[in-house]
């Protein structure tokens, strides 16, 4: 059944000042065994923590802003509507630019 998820329904799991993780899947109040979707929000000029997902691939879509995704030791420039695919086991983090960075992260479980 289709559902609209409002911004105010999405809870924030803040990791460090200037960086937020918001779970869209949790806002639905249901456990999805197939997919998890999160919004990653970085204020301007912030370095996110490093992440590694050892058992899932991910699709990352830049909603707005600019910055860099550093995957292993390679830097990938990001701007609005960039799409980045990460395979399981890759280490990555984000560096937001002057506009900040907002990313939609989708993983198939």
Predicted segments — roles?
Residues 1-34, 49:
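A short, N-terminal "cap"/entry segment at the start of jelly-roll beta-barrel domains
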Residues 25, 36-54:
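Conserved short histidine dyad/triad with adjacent acidic residue
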Residues 38, 63-64, 79-80:
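A cytosolic small-molecule/anion-sensing beta-strand core signal
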Residues 39, 85, 99-109:
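A short hydrophobic beta-strand segment most commonly corresponding to one strand
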Residues 41-42, 52-69:
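Short, conserved beta-strand element in jelly-roll/cupin
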Residues 49-50, 69-70, 86, 91-98:
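Short beta-strand His + acidic residue motifs that chelate non-heme Fe in jelly-roll/DSBH
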Residues 73-88:
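Short acidic-glycine-tyrosine-enriched beta hairpin
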